[in-house]
Amino acid sequence: MGPENRRVLLATVLSVAVLIVWQFVFPSPKPKPQPPKPPEAAQRAEAPAAPAPGQPAAQAPAPAVPQDAPEQLVKLVGDGFEATLTSHGGAVKEIVLQGEKFRRDREGKPVQIDLVRVAKEQPYPLAVVATPELGGAEDAGNDVAARAPMRVVAQDARSATFEGRAGKATVRKTYRLTEKAYELALDLEVQAPATQGGGIVVLYPGYMPPDTKKGGFFSGPPVEFVRPVCRAGEETERFDVDGKEAQEKLQGTVAWAGMDQGYFVSAVFPAQPAGTCLFAKGPVQGSGLTALRLPLDGGSAKFGFTVYSGPKDLDHLRTYGREFESAIDYGAMARPFAFFARLLLFVMRWLERLVANWGLAIILLTVLVKVLLYPLTAKSMQSMNEMRKLQPEIEKLKAKHGNDREKLNLATMQLYQQHKVNPLGGCLPMLIQLPIWFALYATLQTSVELYREPFLWIHDLTVKDPLYVLPIAMGVSQYVMQRFSPQPADNAQAKMMLYFMPGFFTLLMLSVPAGLTLYIFVNNLLSIAQQQFMMRRMPAVPAPAKASK
């Protein structure tokens, strides 16, 4: 590889690295909390009609439950989770995932992950408000009716029914376990005066403590991460609870709506896509709300919902249809590599079934990629060897043209063409590896299969190496690889490639997921072995002659 092309490659790699570092080192500052804005008139437009709900027979309004009524709790144990329902709003107080994989450290002790995270000023998920008008989500989210006590009128091991008042309306909610993992069914019946009209608002709040790091290109989303999400029309939209906007109304009929929680998601599915969706900030900093708004037909209606709260397992999400797999967010920088990320996950799943460890699967993936790229790498090294043979001629051209860069570059390109040498041939293996790195990063940041998966001393391949052993080993291997590589004639450039690049990549990898660092480290070891093997098979190249003064 010639000096000019080494500079092009170095500039490309450094440019990508700077973009990565900028996102991590200089994150966007969090704005100061703003008081919620009142909903505008335009946001009170009538929602699209729900899918032909059946109208129940008229009944006398249920008596109101006293505000000081004691809280009643009902536990439903489903496939992979345990849900705790509360009479405060007839809502969901806890959704605790089962299994050793779904744990987090709290005060030094492992506890099961609870997907319900709300501030004390917020209602619980799946609270319902009946309103004369379909107003803003902020009004609904702060409405005392969303936390009004309800009574438990029926319960067994697989279901529970709550009944109470929401304004002038009677609300009856029945939760049922289904046969699917991480799933509840919710039947909702609303009885309201025929003159009331308006609609109901199903609320899904979330809270992220202000000191929670959202993660960046390097660090994945923490367990405490929350972000309102909704599939409306043909788009899946998300809302930043710490952003500038107080609320956002989405266009299009709602397929599902809920809360994005990093490797997990909680979502409400209407029986058929219906209603409208609105995001809003909550009453305290770090809190947010997704509101699914549905119209009432003649003041009363029945609605059916499916509720999913669990891991973002790609295959499982696809069983729901409605583009539910779009709940997996690869992020702005890794989104172009989403296809490759899914392909890598498919391959690693197959490898993991063979070796029963995700760390070993990543090592086998590295070997597989290296084997597939071997013909290209061999051709690249041959091209670099041919470039080294031309180095004496290039030195003569430098002596001839001196500081005239234009003439030197033109003469150099003519020399390459004369000897049929591709000056970019040595760059191709590195350039091809870059998309694989991005795709593997995206896989580690979004695939719950790799979440909390250990390898040797590393307790979780999706976060950084806690002992920094892998980044340091990767830096040493990078140095050795550069040492064995053909060096450019320019001493300053040679020193930069030999010392700066390994040091820079070591710093870069300190906060990168350990799984990605493992891939690059093993790739470096294989590259060193391949270099030694191929250099022994190639004819020796004489040292370049020094340019005459």
UniProtKB/Swiss-Prot annotation:
Superkingdom field: Bacteria
Recorded topology in the membrane: Multi-pass membrane protein
Pro residues: bias regions: 29-39
Main localization of the protein described in the UniProt heading: membrane
Composition bias, Low complexity: 40-49, 55-68
One Gene Ontology CC term in the entry: plasma membrane
Subcellular location(s) per record: Cell inner membrane
InterPro entries referenced in this protein's UniProt entry, alphabetically: Membr_insert_YidC, Membr_insert_YidC_N, YidC/ALB3/OXA1/COX18, YidC/Oxa/ALB_C, YidC_ALB_C, YidC_periplasmic_sf
Region (Disordered): 29-68
Keywords linked to the UniProt accession: Cell inner membrane, Cell membrane, Chaperone, Membrane, Protein transport, Transmembrane, Transmembrane helix, Transport
Biological-process GO terms, alphabetical: protein insertion into membrane; protein transport
Described purpose of this protein according to its UniProt entry: Required for the insertion and/or proper folding and/or complex formation of integral membrane proteins into the membrane. Involved in integration of membrane proteins that insert both dependently and independently of the Sec translocase complex, as well as at least some lipoproteins. Aids folding of multispanning membrane proteins.
Matching PANTHER family: CYTOCHROME C OXIDASE ASSEMBLY PROTEIN COX18, MITOCHONDRIAL, OXA1
Family: Belongs to the OXA1/ALB3/YidC family. Type 1 subfamily.
Subunit field text: Interacts with the Sec translocase complex via SecD. Specifically interacts with transmembrane segments of nascent integral membrane proteins during membrane integration.
Protein name, entry field: Membrane protein insertase YidC
